[in-house]
Structure formats: structure tokens, C-alpha cells
């Protein structure tokens, strides 16, 4: 008797369902993707009990012909590809022909569909077995309902999470699809309650507002970049808006949401030193490319893909984000609201909200969050009108300018303390050089600020006609020192420094294996490792550009890079070394500065290429606008 047999289709579908249908969110994803492939312009998703009791997807797409309805639930039956050639230029979200039979094999399914001709077709399946098929009256489109999910696979049902968790996963899937397809109107209901609604007018920013709230949408910066092979667009939130996890970064390739570690790192690299350690950005990155450059046939879920010329694409994503932020003024307001989205405003959100606001809206608000939101930096034109009305009651800013101007001659006669002068002077020279060589950087990203004092020997207080500024002096000079050392360390030569006392480095077994494997690569960058006992190496010489006193830290950074990327990136290494040097060299807290020292530091900061955060991503400047100050003292209501 033969031991090897061919599994029947029913069992094969249940096995395939283990990969395709992991949880209720997987069902929603597959059904909505089918609706999108059918050219739908309106998709409604209804779920009950987190999708465990019922999932219903209704669309106004092309529908399915009567003779194809039964075939659609056969394994590997599809209308989206026909030949081998089609597999290498896939333009649809689905193509494997596994979703419908896999879903049907572990649930009860009812489908009603019509192509808009003579009525429609209705079919009912239980565990993949057809129980009923016939005609029904309906308009063009498809209405598919899934109930009793995993009823015949108790092992899978046992690992399903709580209703709230499953609803969160479903919401995440629909959010990503809505972001990827702004021209499609999405509605998501849970237990009859509307959770998400998008207009389908093609405006991705409105979709962002519906998902993340208007406050976040107002902080979005548009992205735009392209090469011969790739086009990048989308939005990234300003660095003051961050999250504790990576899940708020959405990568959308040809309308498909994907996960890609290299591209996610490219997004983070675009923010570079603008993000605090342990925080992640909100970003929606749309990537358009030739379908031949991407392989989506990696996993049945189609979330993992392989991209040709991935390194070039990562570089484009990083440069696009960097370029977008170079044009922005990134000083956060001290009173900026941080609340979540306001559902009452989702449906009426328009782009006009980003450029204007009526004073009557502010007076009519009963919510402090709404009031703060409407008085945010988006509405500066309205606020400045009220500021001018009260200008006669406040000390003239000209007095401050005159007082500050009198300090300028002192700067020429009496240089600041040596510790500050070297960093400030070097940074100012570097910033000046960058301004001459790069016309793309907008002028006056940081306004002129006039120091009026210091708080606790740590924070510089400055003002101008726009309000009060609080500057972290350590973070400010750390930024200056970083830019100075980045250029200094950037002068890499092939010269080596012989050491009188060799450096010994102890490694783990894994690190030692990587070092031995890449000895030649390390020699190329001027680092010669000699074995010196078990898991220990000795270094007798190193490149002359290694910073004095930080040789061991630099070598350790090289080893860490080798472990992560299997190569040594000199450019990245220089940046890490510059950050380390700048942190050690910058002035510390409780250091009292003279007026001319504060002024010199603020002027150097204005000319910095990235004046808003220190190299670790912490903010340097916080602003309290004149209006907010007047509001605190009840001068305006």
C-alpha cells in the first residue's frame, strides 16, 4: 500500500488557511484587496465581536459572473494572472487564488455578487462545501459575509486574542489600505458603530486626518522625490510628533502595504538626529516603481516583498525625507496640544483648515482641546492681528534690540570663554560655508532671538516679536560641536597611528567570528586585528582620524556595525564618533553664561544646518508665542 498520497482539496485548503488566514484581520485584508482589484470606489466593512462573530465586506466593484462564482472558490483559481510572464509584472493586490478557498474552508461564507446585468448570484458555503447556489436581486458589486470563523479549527481559535485586540488589528489593516487608496471611500463599522470613514476624494492628507486626527495631520510635511526607477511621495510628521513603536510608519509600494526592514530604517535615517532615542516617526511613504522591480510572491500574506535596487531606493527615501525637513521651521510650541483625534471633526475636515481659521470658531468652542488646536501655529495670521492690538501695552521689542545691539561691539573686543568660543566659532564658520554651497536651505529657519537671561544655569531665555524662546544651552552647543566635529572627523586619510601601548578588545564568540570573517574589510579601513588569546584581539595601530581618548569606543562602534550590517560604513561611523565627541565637549548644565556668550551661541544656532534638535534628537528650542503668553495672563480670552 502506498504511503504517499495526494491530499484532497478540502484538507489542502485548511492547510493553506494556516498561512493565509491567521486571524480575523487576515480575512478583512484579503476580502478588501479583492474589492480593490475589482475597481471598487466604495467599500464598507462591517465586523462584530472583533470579526469572530461576523465579517461583511460590501463593494461597488465589477462583480463576478454567474459561471465564475463557483470557480472563484477553487484553489489557485484566479482571473488576475494567466502566464508565467504575468507573474513577473503583477499589477493587482491578489494573484495566488488562495484567499477565498482558504477563508471558506474554516468558516461559513455567503456571497452575493452581480456584474450589473440580469440580476446577481448568491452562494452559501460551510467549511468549503457548497450548500446553496441561486439567483438574487442586487446592483453591481459584491457582498460577502463570513461567520463562525475557525469553527472547525479549534487549535487556531484558541490563539485568537481578545475582541479589542482583534478589532485593533482589523482597524490597522483598513487604515493602511485607506492610506494606500485615497481615491476609494472606506467605511469601517464595529458592532454597528462607525470606526472609520474616508471620503475617497483622492486627498491622502484627509485620510491621515481621519485616522490619526487633525492635530497630527497639521504637523505633516509633504514628501517628493524621484529617480529613473522610483518615485517617492507621501507625508512625514514633524519630529515633535513621535510614537513609541515603529507601527506608525506605513510603506506603500504600488498601492500595496508592505513590511521591509531596510526601507523602515531608511525612513528613520531620514529623520536622523531629529528623533529622540527610543521614539519613532509617523510617516506614510508612497513608492511607485515598475512591477518588474518587485517580487511579491514571497509569502502568501504578500506583506514581505523583495525589491530590486533596494539600496538605491533606500537612499532615495532617506534623501527625500531629509530634503523635506531642511525646508521646515521645526521649533515646537510649549503649549502645543498633544491630544488624540477628535471624531466629531473627521467628516468635515478640509484642506482649508491648514491655511485659515475663523475667530468665531475659537469663541464657539466648548472643549479646551479644540480651542488649543484651533489656536495652534497653523492660525498665526489670525493671532498676530490680536497681538498687534495689544502691542502698546507691552514693552517695546525695540528696547531689547537696542540692548542686544550694544553687546555686538563687546563681542569683537571681548571674546567669550574659550570653551564656548571654539565650538561656536567652528559651528558658525561651518554653517556659513554650508549656506554658500547649498541654495536649497531656506533662510531664517530660526528667527533672530535676543537673550534676556538664563534659568538655573541651564536654559537661555530669549525673545523677539513672535514670543519667548527657551533654549537648552547644552543641547544647542552639542549641535554646534557635532557639526564642527563631523567635518573634522570627516577628513579621513590613509595614515595610521602606531600605538606604544596596544589596545586589547575582548569579544563574544559571535563577534570574534564576524571579525575573523571580515579581517580584510577591516584592513581596508585601517584597522588591523591580531589574535591575542580566546575571543581577544590586539590592535597596534589605528587611523589617525580616530578621536584622541575615544579610540576604544570607535573600535567598538566598528564591531557593532559589522554585526548589524556585515560591513563597516565609514560615513555612519564618523557620525557616531562626532556625536560622542560633541556630547563630551559641550557645555554642561549649571554653567552660567555672560550675555555676549548667550548671544554668540544663539547666532551660531541660527546658522546651523539642523538647529532644532541635538544629535540625540532632543529639542533645542521651545517657543511660547506672544498670544499664548497673553492668554495665560487673561489679556485675551
From Swiss-Prot:
One Gene Ontology cellular component annotation held by this UniProt entry: mismatch repair complex
UniProt GO molecular function: ATP binding; ATP hydrolysis activity; ATP-dependent DNA damage sensor activity; mismatched DNA binding
PROSITE patterns in alphabetical order: DNA_MISMATCH_REPAIR_1
UniProt keyword annotation of DNA damage present: yes
One record GO biological process: mismatch repair
NCBIfam families named in the record: mutl, PRK00095.1-3
Family classification: Belongs to the DNA mismatch repair MutL/HexB family.
Protein known as: DNA mismatch repair protein MutL
Protein's organism: Halalkalibacterium halodurans (strain ATCC BAA-125 / DSM 18197 / FERM 7344 / JCM 9153 / C-125) (Bacillus halodurans)
Amino acid at each position: 500500500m502506498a504511503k504517499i498520497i495526494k491530499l484532497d482539496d478540502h484538507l489542502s485548503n485548511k492547510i493553506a488557511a494556516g498561512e493565509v488566514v491567521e486571524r480575523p484581520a487576515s480575512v478583512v485584508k484579503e476580502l478588501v484587496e479583492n474589492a480593490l482589484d475589482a475597481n471598487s470606489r466604495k467599500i464598507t466593512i462591517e465586523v462584530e465581536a472583533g470579526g469572530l462573530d461576523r465579517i461583511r465586506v460590501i463593494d461597488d466593484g465589477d462583480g463576478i459572473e454567474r459561471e465564475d462564482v463557483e470557480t472563484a472558490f477553487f484553489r489557485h483559481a484566479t482571473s488576475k494572472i494567466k502566464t508565467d510572464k504575468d507573474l513577473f509584472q503583477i499589477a493587482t493586490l491578489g494573484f495566488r487564488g488562495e484567499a477565498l478557498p482558504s477563508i471558506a474552508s474554516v468558516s461559513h461564507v455567503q456571497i452575493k455578487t452581480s456584474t450589473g446585468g440580469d440580476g446577481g448570484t448568491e452562494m452559501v458555503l460551510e467549511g468549503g462545501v457548497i450548500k446553496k447556489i441561486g439567483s438574487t436581486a442586487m446592483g453591481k458589486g459584491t457582498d460577502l459575509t463570513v461567520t463562525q470563523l475557525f469553527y472547525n479549527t479549534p487549535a487556531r481559535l484558541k490563539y485568537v486574542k481578545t475582541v479589542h485586540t482583534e478589532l485593533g488589528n482589523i482597524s490597522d489593516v483598513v487604515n493602511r489600505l485607506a492610506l494606500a487608496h485615497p481615491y476609494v471611500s472606506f467605511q469601517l463599522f464595529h458592532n454597528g458603530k462607525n470606526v472609520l470613514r474616508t471620503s475617497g476624494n483622492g486627498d491622502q492628507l484627509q485620510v491621515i486626518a481621519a485616522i490619526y486626527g487633525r492635530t497630527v495631520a497639521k504637523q505633516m510635511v509633504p514628501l517628493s522625490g524621484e529617480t529613473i526607477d522610483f518615485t517617492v511621495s507621501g507625508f512625514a510628521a514633524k519630529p515633535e510628533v513621535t510614537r513609541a513603536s515603529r507601527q506608525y510608519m506605513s510603506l506603500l509600494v504600488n498601492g500595496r502595504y508592505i513590511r521591509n526592514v531596510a526601507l523602515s530604517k531608511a525612513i528613520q535615517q531620514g529623520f536622523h538626529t531629529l528623533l529622540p532615542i527610543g521614539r519613532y516617526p509617523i510617516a506614510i511613504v508612497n513608492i511607485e516603481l515598475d512591477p518588474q522591480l518587485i517580487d511579491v510572491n514571497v509569502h502568501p500574506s504578500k506583506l514581505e516583498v523583495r525589491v530590486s535596487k533596494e539600496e538605491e531606493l533606500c537612499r532615495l527615501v532617506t534623501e527625500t525625507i531629509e530634503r523635506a525637513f531642511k525646508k521646515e521651521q521645526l521649533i515646537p510650541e510649549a503649549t502645543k496640544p498633544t491630544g488624540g483625534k477628535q471624531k466629531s471633526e473627521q467628516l468635515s475636515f478640509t484642506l482649508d483648515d491648514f491655511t485659515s481659521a475663523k475667530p468665531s470658531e475659537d469663541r464657539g468652542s466648548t472643549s479646551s482641546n479644540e480651542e488649543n488646536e484651533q489656536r495652534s501655529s497653523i492660525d498665526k495670521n489670525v493671532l498676530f492681528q490680536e497681538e498687534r492690538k495689544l502691542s502698546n501695552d507691552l514693552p517695546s521689542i525695540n528696547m531689547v534690540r537696542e540692548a542686544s545691539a550694544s553687546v555686538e561691539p563687546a563681542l569683537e573686543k571681548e571674546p567669550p570663554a574659550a570653551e564656548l568660543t571654539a565650538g561656536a566659532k567652528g559651528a558658525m564658520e561651518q554653517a556659513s560655508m554650508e549656506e554658500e554651497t547649498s541654495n536649497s536651505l531656506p533662510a531664517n529657519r530660526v528667527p533672530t532671538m535676543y537673550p534676556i537671561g538664563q534659568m538655573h544655569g541651564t536654559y537661555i531665555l530669549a525673545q523677539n516679536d513672535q514670543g519667548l524662546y527657551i533654549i537648552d544651552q547644552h543641547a544647542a552647543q552639542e549641535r554646534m560641536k557635532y557639526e564642527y566635529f563631523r567635518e573634522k572627523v570627516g577628513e579621513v586619510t590613509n595614515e595610521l597611528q602606531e600605538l606604544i601601548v596596544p589596545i586589547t578588545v575582548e569579544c563574544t564568540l559571535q563577534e570574534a567570528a564576524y571579525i575573523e570573517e571580515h579581517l580584510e574589510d577591516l584592513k581596508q579601513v585601517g584597522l588591523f586585528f591580531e589574535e591575542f588569546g580566546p575571543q581577544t584581539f590586539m590592535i597596534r595601530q589605528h587611523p589617525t582620524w580616530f578621536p584622541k581618548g575615544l579610540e576604544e569606543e570607535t573600535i567598538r562602534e566598528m564591531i557593532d556595525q559589522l554585526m548589524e550590517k556585515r560591513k563597516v560604513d565609514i560615513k555612519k561611523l564618523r557620525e557616531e564618533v562626532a556625536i560622542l565627541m560633541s556630547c563630551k565637549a559641550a557645555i554642561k548644565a549649571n554653567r552660567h553664561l555672560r550675555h555676549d556668550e548667550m548671544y554668540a551661541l544663539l547666532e551660531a544656532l541660527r546658522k546651523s544646518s539642523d538647529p532644532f534638535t541635538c544629535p540625540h534628537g532632543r529639542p533645542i528650542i521651545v517657543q511660547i508665542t506672544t498670544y499664548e503668553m497673553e492668554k495665560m495672563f487673561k489679556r485675551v480670552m
